[in-house]
Amino acid sequence: MKLARGPRYKVPLRRRREGKTNYRKRLKLLLSRKPRLVVRITNRRVIAQIVEYAPEGDRVVVGVDSAMLREFGWKGDLNNTPAAYLTGILIAKKALQKGIGEAVLDIGLHTPTRGSRVFAVLRGAVEGGLEVPHSDEVLPDDSRIRGEHIAAYYEMNPERFGEYEKRGLKPSDLPAHVDEIKEKLMVIS
């Protein structure tokens, strides 16, 4: 870490120093005066929250974790593209139940990469009924949403998918499994 030099040095805010908050981007999102769809990807799961600004601290109105997909019978991994998409559908349905129909996407410090898991959550939220301003170019295509790339990789390296088989899912059946879980999530009102 570089030490402060000179009288004009300004110490960055704590969350900026920790690499957690980009305050310039946060201000632009807050000026929209809409709730934020906050998406965070961890090593094990996908987290999506609808967050509203409050002067004393942001308020989480609705929070969903990809582990909640297990309640609907999801047998796949919790942090891949299909799980992110299904998490997006679930957050949209729960937000609509709370009376929130629109939001702006907050990806934090994630790099906005076309077709990434962050945008898979966005696609799920939009298809689930949430209005979020976006460009269709960034959304992942249907084959990635359904997990066809995972099924194709399974054909090349079947020994890497022991966890799927322990949970009772053959990775080649993943696209059909995604469609099945999507149908269950879409009927939530």
Curated annotation (Swiss-Prot):
GO terms for molecular function: 5S rRNA binding; structural constituent of ribosome. It holds the Pfam family Ribosomal_L5e. The keyword NADP does not apply. GO terms for biological process: ribosomal large subunit assembly; translation. Keywords: Ribonucleoprotein, Ribosomal protein, RNA-binding, rRNA-binding. InterPro entries: Rbsml_uL18_euk (IPR005485). It comes from the Archaea. Part of the 50S ribosomal subunit. Contacts the 5S and 23S rRNAs. This is one of the proteins that bind and probably mediate the attachment of the 5S RNA into the large ribosomal subunit, where it forms part of the central protuberance. Belongs to the universal ribosomal protein uL18 family. This is Large ribosomal subunit protein uL18. The gene is rpl18.
